[in-house]
């Protein structure tokens, strides 16, 4: 009963903190941390200690999985270099620097134990991402922070494990640590990918959305547990499974399953994140009490925590600054090279497109200047492959893939050019590296043989709580002062391009329908397709693009703010009325009269039902074609991830409304 009461009170605290966070302009995590600390110091509340495995093995995998599902895989690929620097290199450098300083200022602390403490203080917390997103900073900053948060926990735990082993056994080498880390990541990659693919195949066969959601809750653990038993990182495996699910899910899973899962997972994330910070605050009193019982000074711990916390910020800034300089040079080099090669690339793309369409022989020589290296060398290699004897279908497929690669590279260059990471953005990234509950959970994994373990635990929780409070509360002020690039509405050009994309997809469905009807009704060729081209183009275009309308005015952070369920349905009905009603009798069938005898009324009702069913079928075909077109464009990176996500959500909601059945 006591546990049940605690759980209920905790849920109410999470709900209350989330509800009032906007009013007080403080992140819910910080409010819950403060509540936990206050409650933990009440005389009626005993000292609380939570097993670290509950957080590291029970809470972190689903949280990281949920974040990975929601991240844009194309943006994650683009920012992979930044993520590797921050999630791997920065963690190692932070552990080494902090460990070296602690060795000097804490008597009797060996280098191995000091590096272990440094590893504990290295991983960042996801609360910075939620704060930055609420402030509206650019999506590129959010992607960098999200990618770092997905992987740095695993890196820190590997460094912590290696340092602890070195301190107790003294048989660890640098090469051994590197090999162990590489093996851990490779195992996690294999297990995570396999679990992601297998569970998608399983979920595609599930017909109930609730059952699918239940199965989705097992995925992070299905990935993490085997990976851990095979010597890999369970956290990385959960992340990889999430990336696979997020990338392939829209093509495999029905929209009602995805919508139900997203809503349920959002609630689960809210509860799990809230409990993490409540638990962190509640444990504060027990750690302080243990330190007081063992003798070390609380004041000394506070000063050391201030020193360690300052080092985390300085080291992060020292790594972020050269990383940004390198990224800027890389982006400029890409843009310059692409501009120099623009004419040749366009010629190559045109020839490959012609091969893909079958307009020219697939073995035709394609002129190219081979004096350049880099991209040109890779394209030349692809060209030589195209010239090898092969089937026309395979050549056309390779040519199409080459065009996709060029379009993807062009979109990458535009992305780096339009959303640069400068000093202003770097200041936000550096200041957003606050520590959190993972730091405390990792510190609790220190073995009992660690010298002054409770004292080191106190330093860890002071650094985590202090960085959350100081950096979390001042991050809005930093954003206001440095003025980084902010996330804005989709521009008119992108909106128009998405509009055209959806219209083209709808035209494809209409053309297919005309081809099918040509076989059954000779002489009716092109009737429906002509409507989109010639008959009041404004109304059909608006209807076809209903799922992308208001991208520039309604979107903030990729969330759908409204539904226009009649959009694609209106277009389908319009086409059926004009296409099937080309003669008077067909017109009467499409728009039956509402007067006449009972027999005529019965025929009219049947005609209306038939017309409604035909409209529904065409609408669903259009929606699915538009979704495929959006997903293809998203994989190439042709549009911003937020615009693609918003348009997909609108299509999903429209399809759900068309396919839903009353219970």
PLM region spans:
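Transmembrane helical cores of multi-pass secondary ion antiporters/exchangers
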Residues: 1-504, 556, 561, 589, ...
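Helix-centric, low-specificity signal for extended rod-like, repetitive segments
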Residues: 309, 365, 369-374, 391, ...
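Long amphipathic all-alpha helical oligomerization modules
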Residues: 603-614, 621
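Long, amphipathic alpha-helical stalk/connector segments used for oligomerization, subunit docking
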Residues: 324, 485-597
């Amino acid at each position: 009963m006591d546990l049940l009461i605690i759980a209920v009170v905790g849920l109410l605290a999470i709900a209350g903190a989330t509800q009032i966070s906007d009013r007080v302009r403080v992140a819910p995590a910080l409010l819950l941390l403060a509540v936990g600390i206050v409650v933990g110091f009440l005389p009626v509340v005993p000292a609380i200690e939570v097993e670290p495995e509950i957080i590291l093995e029970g809470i972190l995998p689903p949280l990281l999985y949920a974040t990975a599902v929601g991240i844009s895989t194309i943006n994650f690929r683009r920012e992979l270099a930044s993520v590797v620097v921050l999630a791997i290199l920065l963690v190692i450098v932070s552990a080494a620097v902090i460990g070296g300083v602690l060795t000097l200022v804490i008597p009797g602390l060996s280098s191995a134990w000091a590096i272990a403490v440094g590893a504990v203080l290295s991983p960042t917390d996801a609360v910075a991402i939620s704060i930055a997103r609420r402030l509206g900073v650019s999506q590129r900053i959010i992607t960098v922070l999200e990618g770092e948060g997905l992987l740095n926990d695993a890196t820190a735990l590997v460094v912590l494990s290696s340092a602890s082993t070195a301190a107790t056994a003294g048989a660890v080498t640098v090469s051994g640590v590197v090999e162990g880390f590489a093996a851990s990541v490779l195992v996690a990659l294999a297990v995570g990918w396999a679990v992601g693919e297998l569970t998608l195949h399983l979920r595609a066969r599930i017909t109930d959305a609730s059952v699918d959601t239940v199965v989705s809750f097992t995925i992070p653990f299905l990935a993490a547990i085997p990976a851990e038993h095979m010597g890999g990182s369970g956290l990385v495996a959960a992340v990889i499974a999430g990336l696979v699910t997020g990338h392939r899910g829209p093509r495999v899973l029905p929209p009602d399953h995805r919508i139900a899962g997203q809503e349920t997972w959002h609630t689960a994330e809210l509860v799990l994140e809230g409990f993490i910070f409540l638990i962190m605050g509640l444990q504060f009193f027990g750690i302080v009490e243990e330190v007081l019982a063992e003798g070390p000074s609380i004041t000394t711990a506070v000063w050391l925590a201030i020193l360690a916390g300052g080092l985390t910020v300085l080291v992060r800034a020292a790594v972020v600054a050269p990383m940004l300089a390198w990224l800027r040079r890389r982006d400029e080099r890409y843009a310059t090279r692409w501009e120099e090669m623009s004419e040749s690339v366009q010629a190559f793309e045109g020839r490959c497109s012609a091969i893909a369409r079958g307009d020219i022989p697939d073995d035709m020589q394609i002129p190219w200047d081979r004096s350049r290296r880099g991209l040109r060398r890779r394209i030349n290699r692809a060209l030589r492959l195209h010239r090898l004897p092969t089937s026309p279908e395979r050549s056309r497929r390779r040519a199409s893939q080459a065009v996709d690669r060029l379009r993807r590279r062009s979109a990458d260059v535009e992305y780096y050019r339009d959303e640069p990471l400068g000093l202003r953005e770097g200041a936000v990234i550096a200041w957003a590296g606050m520590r959190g509950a993972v730091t405390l959970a990792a510190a609790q994994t220190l073995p009992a043989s660690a010298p002054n373990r409770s004292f080191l635990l106190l330093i860890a929780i002071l650094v985590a709580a202090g960085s959350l409070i100081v950096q979390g509360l001042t991050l809005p002020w930093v954003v206001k002062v440095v003025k980084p690039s902010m996330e804005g509405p989709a521009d008119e050009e992108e909106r128009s391009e998405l509009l055209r994309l959806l219209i083209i997809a709808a035209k494809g469905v209409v053309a297919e329908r005309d081809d099918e009807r040509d076989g059954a009704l000779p002489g009716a060729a092109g009737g429906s397709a002509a409507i989109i081209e010639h008959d009041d183009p404004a109304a059909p275009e608006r209807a076809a693009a209903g799922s992308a309308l208001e991208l520039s005015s309604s979107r903030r952070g990729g969330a759908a703010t409204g539904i226009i369920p009649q959009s694609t349905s209106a277009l389908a009905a319009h086409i059926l009325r004009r296409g099937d009603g080309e003669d008077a009798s067909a017109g009467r069938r499409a728009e039956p009269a509402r007067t006449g005898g009972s027999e005529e009324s019965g025929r009219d009702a049947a005609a209306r039902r038939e017309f409604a069913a035909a409209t529904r079928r065409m609408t669903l075909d259009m929606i699915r074609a538009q979704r495929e077109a959006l997903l293809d464009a998203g994989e190439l990176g042709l549009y911003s991830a937020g615009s693609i996500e918003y348009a997909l959500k609108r299509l999903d909601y429209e399809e759900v409304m068309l396919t839903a059945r009353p219970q």
